[in-house]
From Swiss-Prot:
Disulfide bonds join 47-125, 184-268, 324-404, 460-542. InterPro entries: Ig-like_dom (IPR007110), Ig-like_dom_sf (IPR036179), Ig-like_fold (IPR013783), Ig_sub (IPR003599), Ig_V-set (IPR013106), IgSF_V-set/TM_domain (IPR051102). The keyword Glycoprotein applies. GO terms for cellular component: axon; membrane; myelin sheath; plasma membrane; synapse. Induction: Induced by neurite outgrowth in neuroblastoma cell lines Neuro-2a. The lineage of its organism: Eukaryota, Metazoa, Chordata, Craniata, Vertebrata. Member of the immunoglobulin superfamily (IgSF) that links tetraspanin-enriched microdomains to the actin cytoskeleton and plays several important roles in innate and adaptive immunity. Acts as an inducible receptor of HSPA8 on dendritic cells to enhance the CCL21/SLC-dependent migration of activated mature dendritic cells while attenuating their antigen-specific stimulatory capacities. In complex with alpha-actinins ACTN1 and ACTN4, regulates actin dynamics in the immune synapse and subsequent T-cell activation. Inhibits the entry of several viruses such as hepatitis C Virus (HCV) or HIV-1. PROSITE patterns: IG_LIKE. This is Immunoglobulin superfamily member 8. Expressed in lymphocytes as well as in many tissues with higher expression in brain. Detected in all regions of the brain with weak expression in the pituitary. Expressed selectively by neurons but not by glial cells. Expressed in myoblasts (at protein level). Disruption phenotype: Igsf8-deficient female mice show no fertilization defect. Igsf8-deficient eggs retain normal level and localization of CD9, resulting in normal microvilli formation, which indicates that IGSF8 is dispensable in fertility.
Amino acid sequence: MGVPSPTPLSSLLLLLLILGTRCYARQVHVPRGPLYRVAGTAVSISCNVSDYEGPAQQDFEWFMYRPEAPATSLGIVSTKDSQFSYAVFGPRVASGDLQVQRLKGDSVVLKIARLQAQDSGFYECYTPSTDTQYLGNYSAKVELRVLPDELQVSAAPPGPRGRQAATSPSRLTVHEGQELALGCLAQTKTKKHTHLSVSFGRAIPEAPVGRATLQEVVGLRSDMAVEAGAPYAERLASGELRLSKEGTDRYRMVVGGAQAGDSGTYHCTAAEWIQDPDGSWVQVAEKRAVLAHVDVQTLSSQLAVTVGPGERRIGPGEPLELLCNVSGALPPPGRHAAYSVGWEMAPAGAPGPGRLVAQLDTEGIGSLGPGYEDRHIAMEKVASRTYRLRLEAARPADAGTYRCLAKAYVRGSGTRLREAASARSRPLPVHVREEGVVLEAVAWLAGGTVYRGETASLLCNISVRGGPPGLRLAASWWVERPEEGELSSGPAQLVGGVGQDGVAELGVRPGGGPVSVELVGPRSHRLRLHGLGPEDEGIYHCAPSAWVQHADYSWYQAGSARSGPVTVYPYTHAVDTLFVPLLVGTGVALVTGASVLATITCCFMKRMRKR
């Protein structure tokens, strides 16, 4: 009998049996090519194997095929044979310029530390078989093309159209608050389509340059996105830090409002990027150039203030002029910096800088300090950095030590001003002669005794010794009332007075009744309290003062005094003391009579009910 022919079902079962006993087919993988890299840079080409039999650690061998001999393989390096390299690659393998690095058992990477033009060609990754059957592929090739280094980076000279960089890095001195502007020229002539990224960085003064010491300030990424280093992110967001591209190859960084921490050596780093066949962008070249050594001079180290013309001795009513000079290597006031200047005065022997007399703010607007609003005082800028304070008529109270205070401001983002420095001058003594006015006052209660409801008249006689012609007197009346339950009196309250200009001023009378104050003689004043009441009881005194008027029509107090105490006690009239018992007796009699009448009426009504 003949052998039966296989049926389709049996053939299918046989095929499944064969596939079930053998499911391995070795695959070697390398990146898709061609890969474009730049001479002088490093490259890493990965290789891994899958679907293999045998040990987990596989061996790898790398070969190269040069364009001029595409059929000739040149052994580069192997994971199992240290003598594998051909003579042309031996020195580079020995120096580490060419090496294979194992990532894991079935994956390695070929590393070339510094590409050369003759490294262009096909690279083959081969894996010796450890399989029971020869299935799949045991090698894979990728093309590497080495491009010449066409990347150029240099410092851009000042001016928007500059092209030639200086032979050595410049040294720039920038004042705090000013703009720091640096330019960088970066271009490539590579024939392939590439992108450039440009980054501005700063290294602290005298620090070696490297990735560890170079702090990125701001950079333009390969996708044209602008990003800042972490310490500068806020300044970029506020617009204080800017980066722009001008033309095809010029990049400009502007740091507004330079700070002390901005000092250092600035570099420009340009990187060239190319897109691999797998769609990823890879950096293929990088170069760095020193732009400038920048020194930011802080305003606090430069600001200085001097005053003149020296110690002053003047008489009352004379003008007082003081000059203040602000010096130092300072930026002019304007878009980046502003200044304010003021004068302070402290009485002789008083601690601290004193109180403000007058000042010019950052806008040049003048203002007077507390207590000087009614004075004829001028504060003005008489030269570029010279300021003058003028008091039209000095007073003895103006004597003391004067200091000039200057403040420097820098403008941050927008129009916001930030105080950066301040300086005070040395003290300048000013002496103003006293007028020599001596006042004495004697006050008394006319009549000696006053009763409730009457008018109390208090008189005050003033005597004057010394003083200039035209001296005028003023007098005011004050009362200290005894506080309830206290032995001592409360604070003095103004009752009334007459000023040096003859105008009466009325205060608050304790009893609330009418008050009159008047000048009854050249140096005699009178206070009258009408309708005296018990609330007017207290201790009164007269307080005269001497006033001098200067040519600028301002008044100043040249002297003062205080009289002795005058006790005002409103007595009660004798008839009033008799009238009180009468009222009390009448009241008691009425109450007693009413009580008796009520008792009799009550008893009578009870008897009527019983009947």
